[in-house]
């Protein structure tokens, strides 16, 4: 009896709130749950890690591209998922730690799931809507370095004598702004910082290894490149990176969104088009 009464009361509250929303937004109200939006973005990626030493003449910028979708959960919250591709790079030749002379370039995919929180409700139909985002994903790291005119993959060489995980978790957080330009189209800007659960995005983390344990002459040459700038070789145990700081990369993108909507909205549009 009590259980039935509780269900009845909760159902009544839900319909009351839903009815107030409909009255608030009048004929333009659409229940937000299930509204689907396709997203795309293009912009720049910026690297922050062991080979960055303040602002230098080598900014470490590269391109970034993303495609994904938003699935509306409530008036303010959406689940989001994306696949992204990015390139970042750095070269110590242009930094205060030029004596190490290490460099890298990586072109990586990443996949993530998260939550987006819009400042204005879905049914407010605001032309401009700021939002916040947070999520988690994975990235596949493919660091390379150029030597003798060739780009060599660094991870298989184990330049620090360590075999590291090339598919680490990535935690993301960011802000954005979306501006409606048509009934179903919007454009905007998004800034997203990506915290990698690894210090090997750039293949540099800890100390110089015992070079005799490395697998090849190529591995030894790419582990210690000081001689290329006329400096004496590094010694095992000397600092090569900063193991207490994990790597990050940041995206600044122009975004384009297309609202598909819910099944109910699609059905209503179909009825409007029919004579």
Predicted feature locations:
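Gram-negative (and chloroplast) outer-membrane scaffold detector with strong preference
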Residues: 77, 82-149
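Extracellular loop and loop/strand-boundary signature of outer-membrane beta-barrel proteins
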Residues: 25-26, 48-55, 97-104, 157-163, ...
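Short glycine/proline- and aromatic-enriched beta-strand/turn motifs that initiate or cap beta-hairpins
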Residues: 20-70, 247-263
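Residues that define the transmembrane beta-barrel architecture of outer-membrane proteins
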Residues: 34, 59-63, 107-111, 128, ...
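Outer-membrane beta-barrel translocator domains and adjoining extracellular loop/strand segments
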Residues: 50-55, 91-98, 143-151, 200-207
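Short loop/turn motifs that connect adjacent beta-strands in outer-membrane beta-barrel proteins
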Residues: 21-35, 76, 121-128, 181-184, ...
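Residues on the lipid-exposed face of transmembrane beta-strands in outer-membrane beta-barrel proteins
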Residues: 40-44, 67-71, 113-117, 134-138, ...
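Predominantly the C-terminal beta-signal and adjacent terminal strand-loop region
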Residues: 182-275
